[in-house]
Amino acid sequence: MKPGIHPEYREVVFQDIGADFSFLTRSTIAAKETIKWTDGKEYPLVKIEVSSQSHPFYTGKQKILDTAGRVEKFRQKYGM
């Protein structure tokens, strides 16, 4: 590998601001803020709006649309 062209791969804390949930993982993303983690070390912090703790698919609060009913209404309305 060529030296100096690859991004730094390091441990980063991602914080879901909607669900008050944080997790530590590795990433190459640039971060301006830092946070002290539970192990006492300081890590770069990236704030995100959606994670598995707040996304409706993972939380079970997903709305299921009745697409078949909508198609039938459309066909009845326009005589198809």
From Swiss-Prot:
Species for this entry: Methylobacillus flagellatus (strain ATCC 51484 / DSM 6875 / VKM B-1610 / KT)
Family of this protein: Belongs to the bacterial ribosomal protein bL31 family. Type B subfamily.
Subunit structure and binding partners: Part of the 50S ribosomal subunit.
A GO BP annotation: translation
Keywords: Ribonucleoprotein, Ribosomal protein
Listed HAMAP family: Ribosomal_bL31_2
InterPro entries per UniProt: Ribosomal_bL28/bL31-like_sf, Ribosomal_bL31, Ribosomal_bL31_B, Ribosomal_bL31_sf
Segment forming the signal sequence: none
Gene Ontology MF: a single term: structural constituent of ribosome
A cellular component term, taken from the record's GO annotations: ribonucleoprotein complex
Bilayer-spanning residue ranges: none
Protein name in UniProt: Large ribosomal subunit protein bL31B
Domain of life: Bacteria
Keyword Ribonucleoprotein belongs to the record: yes
UniProt cross-references to PANTHER family, sorted A to Z: 50S RIBOSOMAL PROTEIN L31, CHLOROPLASTIC, LARGE RIBOSOMAL SUBUNIT PROTEIN BL31C
NCBIfam families from the UniProt entry: L31, PRK01678.1
